[in-house]
Amino acid sequence: MRFLLVLQLVFFYFSAATTNSPKKCSRNSINLGKLIDTLLTDYDTHLLPEAEGVNVTIELHVQGVSGISEITGDFSLDVMYSEIWQDPRLSFKHLNVCATNITLKSDFRKKIWTPDTCIINSKSSSIHSSPSENTFVILYENGLVWSNFRLNVKTPCSVNLKMFPFDSLSCEIVLESYSFNTDEVRLMWHDVPITMMEKVELPDFDLIGWSTDHQRLEYPNGIWDRAKVKFTFARRYGFYLFQSYFPTSLTVISSWVGFFFDVRSVSARITLGVSSLLALTFQFGNVLRHLPRVSYIKCLDVWMIFSVIFIFCTLVELAIVCQLNRWERERQIGSKVLGHWLNQIRKTRKKESKADEGGGGGVGGLLRKRIPVLAQLKAAATDSNSGAATAMTTAIQPPNTNLNSITNSDNSKLVANNFTSIEHETYAYEKKRGFSHCFQRFVYAICPPDRDWTITSVQVDRCSMIMFPLSFLIFNVVYWSIYFMKMDRPM
């Protein structure tokens, strides 16, 4: 009796262990066709899985970014898009199938209810087919449906080139349910909404971050859920530093070499300035060729405009130097003429002194002849370029005067006073004839004639050697300080 009791206990133990052990079976033993037919019996694809609406969880797995175009304002990327929802009608836990989930092809998706989500702002999108359509559906035993697509998507980007080439772009992907409002489908992001297969690297941009957002948008026929992800790309400005900023800086600096040339090397300095200006224009046009035509000023535009101004100012400086050099040559010729007729006056005074000793003539004749002599001398000085200096030496003859009626001491004093006041009387004579008398008095009050205000071409060149580099240095400090402070990303 005791032996039978022990056998009964052993039997119950092994039977309980067998019942509690998990089923071990092969997936090949599952008849998926029969299972699908069973699940889809009396299944209506137009009815919601649940009357109170469906919560759809979405996530994106970015495989790579193909490229970004500022001209068209969009970017392309390859992404695996997943959407997950609960459909109790597809639960097969009660069927004692030897699997917790089954993977089905894209054809199965057409036979069940789907949330009909779409990328609402896409310019173009397509499902990869390599070689077959990259779509699958995973069905769990509790009725959880996981649908996945491998897509190539092109969506718009917000392009603002005011900070170019230190700018950043924002590109968005906006997801909505095309057919169902919030009473039927509610979109929500997964706990880990965005994942990257690998680091995104582009020739011109770096992906510096992304962010997700959830919104509700009101349409005339209801309120729709909207899930949005924004990718932020920062431009790599190293290319523009080496292809735009450094060459233009060297072009501006090379235009200053003309300051060290001789003043008479006009053709060489003009060639240098014009060549620098053309090179700068060509560099600027090469950069603009790959950018959209915008009406606002970009960061690079400010640099190029000031570079053109610096080179143009070198040409203006050259024009000023050439004009000053011409005036200097005219003054040199005029000084030679002036020295010649001053010698003539000295000779005339000596002859008058000798004539005084001999007597006769009178002061009146000398005073009457002084003004015509001065007029001839002034005409000769102003017409120096035409060879009037040579003619003057023969045209001007000392006045033939006789001062016998005046004593030698009075005569000498009178002649000295008359000839020392030549410049003042000539100025007074011209002042009566001119129409700008008031302006002349104002200028003489500010710039006294006894001070040397002459500026030479050499002085202008020497001043330019200092002022142009100093101005360009100040511009660089202000330019880089302002735009580096405006940058919204680390260097």
From Swiss-Prot:
The keyword Transcription regulation does not apply. It is a multi-pass membrane protein. GO terms for molecular function: extracellular ligand-gated monoatomic ion channel activity; transmembrane signaling receptor activity. InterPro entries: GABAA/Glycine_rcpt, Neur_chan_lig-bd, Neur_chan_lig-bd_sf, Neur_channel, Neuro-gated_channel_TM_sf, Neuro_actylchol_rec, Neurotrans-gated_channel_TM, Neurotransmitter_ion_chnl_CS. Keywords: Cell membrane, Disulfide bond, Glycoprotein, Ion channel, Ion transport, Ligand-gated ion channel, Membrane, Postsynaptic cell membrane, Receptor, Signal, Synapse, Transmembrane, Transmembrane helix, Transport. GO terms for cellular component: postsynaptic membrane. The chain crosses the membrane at residues 241-261, 265-287, 302-322, 465-485. This is Ligand-gated ion channel 50. It comes from Caenorhabditis elegans. The gene is lgc-50.
